[in-house]
A protein has these predicted regions:
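Aromatic- and glycine-enriched beta-alpha-beta binding-site module
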Residues: 124, 136, 141-142
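Active-site nucleotide-donor binding segment shared across nucleotidyl transfer reactions
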Residues: 21-54, 58, 63, 210, ...
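Conserved catalytic core of two-metal-ion nucleotidyltransferases
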Residues: 1-27, 67-127, 147-157, 161-238, ...
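A short secondary-structure junction signal
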Residues: 129-134
Length: 276
């Protein structure tokens, strides 16, 4: 169990989403509730009771537009975070964070942020399955490199377990690997593709673009937000019998390392030591 109460965190996260929803409506940007957040909207009319994060997705052009204009469009204290804006951030997707808070996801993650929602870009993929395997394999390879670049090489001691992280530091740079990941995702244009994907979800995240379609209004914590057009098809593909409540031991949470609702992450005095 996490050392924090779930419901207060959910309500702060919801405030971020409502700000993003307002910006997207004002500027004509497409977004959709995604993954467990969409599941919560359909099954619970809001958050899954034990869920402590929030996901949305956006077609690539809309995602890039939001990230590029977040500083001018988002009201304080919200800001965008991505690999392009933070050299310590390991993700291939972005976050919108509440900069008046501090959140450390894992003890071994060097970057600091605030409470956030995840924003996943959706990109085109090849129509033929045989042509999808290589780009996704390369994407997973470079994603693993990012992990080793950000992990303390001596996390498990100075033996063989440190060799691969140390080798990655000699052969790769964070910026270079992130540029490679972005090139892989951008190779196939979203607007021209019939099949699209959230690359971070791997090959199982490939689906028909028609599934997104024109957004479907969904109720979430008393607010009307945007879900994918064919939500039943998407949720069935991702979760199977998605209306079935999972057993307690399968109710997953993040269990964040550190959470402070009142201190801006920019003022947090990080006492952790990293050998990066």
């Amino acid at each position: 169990m996490p050392a924090y109460e779930i419901r207060p965190l959910q309500l702060r996260i919801l405030e971020i989403l409502l700000a993003v929803d307002k910006v997207c409506r004002e500027h004509g940007l497409r977004y959709y509730l995604w993954a467990g957040t969409l599941l919560g909207a359909i099954r619970h009319k809001g958050f899954i009771p034990w869920d402590d994060d929030m996901d949305i997705c956006m077609p690539r052009a809309d995602y890039d537009t939001l990230m590029a204009h977040a500083k001018e469009w988002l009201p304080a204290p919200y800001e965008a975070m991505s690999a392009e804006t933070n050299g310590k951030y390991p993700g291939s997707f972005g976050k919108i964070i509440d900069s008046s808070t501090t959140l450390i996801e894992r003890a071994h993650y060097a970057y600091l942020s605030g409470i956030y929602i995840d924003v996943f870009p959706i990109d085109g993929v090849p129509q033929r399955a045989c042509r999808r395997r290589l780009p996704f394999a390369r994407f997973e390879f470079y994603k693993r490199i990012v992990y080793f670049l950000h992990r303390d090489p001596y996390k498990h001691g100075r033996g063989p377990s440190s060799w691969l992280p140390l080798l990655c530091r000699k052969c790769f740079s964070h910026a270079g690997v992130q540029q490679t990941l972005r090139r892989l995702m951008l190779k196939y244009n979203y607007e021209d593709a019939q099949l699209v994907a959230d690359y971070d979800d791997g090959l199982k995240g490939v689906f028909s673009k028609a599934l997104l379609g024109e957004s479907t209004p969904v109720s979430f914590e008393g607010h009307e937000l945007k879900g994918v057009a064919q939500y039943d098809r998407y949720l069935t593909q991702k979760y199977g019998d998605y209306m079935q409540i999972p057993a307690t031991n399968h109710q997953r949470q993040h269990n964040f390392y550190y959470l402070d609702y009142n201190q801006p992450y920019s003022e947090y005095k990080d006492q952790r030591k990293f050998r990066l």
